[in-house]
Amino acid sequence: MIEIGENVLLEYIEENELKKAKSKAVSIENNELLIAYPVDVVTGRTVILHNDMEVTVEFVGKDEVPYRFISRIKGKVKDKLQMICLEMPPREKMKRIQRRQYVRTDAVLDVQIQPGNEEEIRTLSYNISAGGIAVVLADGLSFQSGESLRLIIRLPEEEHTRQIETEAVVRRIFNDPKSEKRKMTLEYSEIAAGDQQALLQYCIRRQLNKRRKARME
């Protein structure tokens, strides 16, 4: 199910607060998953996970479908690098993550729309998730619900900007009375597993930052 080197996302409770950390799968054997030391998705700092701590693990499988399962920390393993050992449940204990479960966040990102053989259109997103995106439409642009478009999304990461290319299907076009702008929502139909994982981690980071800022106000 999990490929070696695949990104994994961990959720756990610490001091009554939901925390999220990212890591990579290093080895799988004897119903155990070994991962590199995880780092907090917001601070980028290495996190300490105690033995017997319950964690939720999310990953994108070989079939490019996202999955989730509940696990426990079994301990630390020292080899060429330090690793964390997790319980690995059987496949039937892993749950597929449905598209509606993707974390969604407000975000203004540069987006290029490529409608068939026509000239590309540059616009901005206002909302995004690992399952789809919502963009602003300039006056005069017209698309149909169900139409397939190619998108290029510029996603800011810690050290560089990631360019995500994906096929997407138009789901809805509407007029927003608050902004007085036309908007369009799209669902990704073809997207690389690594790009989808990057989008998921980006949305989670923004949500956690938003919550922390709200608590400080």
From Swiss-Prot:
Residues 98-203 form the PilZ domain. GO terms for molecular function: cyclic-di-GMP binding. It comes from Bacillus subtilis (strain 168). It holds the Pfam family PilZ. InterPro entries: PilZ_domain, T3SS_YcgR_PilZN. This is Uncharacterized protein YpfA.
